[in-house]
Amino acid sequence: MGMVSEFKQFAMRGNVIDLAVGVVIGAAFGKIVTALVEKIIMPPIGWAIGNVDFSRLAWVLKPAGVDATGKEIPAVAIGYGDFINTVVQFLIIAFAIFLVVKLINRVTHRKPDAPKGPSEEVLLLREIRDALKNDTLKPPGAL
């Protein structure tokens, strides 16, 4: 079998296709969560604590300036606001995945139905056993 046909067989297996679909859906879901966090969740929180735009929050270590030649030097800052947004996004995605996994586990790991009682064969064997114990089962022609 040639390398191309082996690759084709590998690529067309169900797990690879499922994984590819999962990656595409995950990327789209990530974009939805990003928009949810940046446009819907964080603005009211920022407004509630004093009109703060979380994406612009930063600790400035060195302010922007101009050097001796007139060239602009950008500020050196730690953008913790973006980090807060990313943490909120992560928590939303992690919770959504938790709910999906919990649902899948509930569907796939159902408890088996309780047995409905002994089968007819078991009941018949019990009757035979009890008859033999009580010596009520006699062969034909026996005294």
From Swiss-Prot:
The chain crosses the membrane at residues 16-36, 84-104. It is found in: Cell inner membrane. GO terms for molecular function: mechanosensitive monoatomic ion channel activity. The keyword ATP-binding does not apply. GO terms for cellular component: plasma membrane. Keywords: Cell inner membrane, Cell membrane, Ion channel, Ion transport, Membrane, Transmembrane, Transmembrane helix, Transport. It comes from the Bacteria. It is a multi-pass membrane protein. Its main location: membrane. Channel that opens in response to stretch forces in the membrane lipid bilayer. May participate in the regulation of osmotic pressure changes within the cell. Homopentamer. HAMAP family: MscL (MF_00115). Belongs to the MscL family. This is Large-conductance mechanosensitive channel.
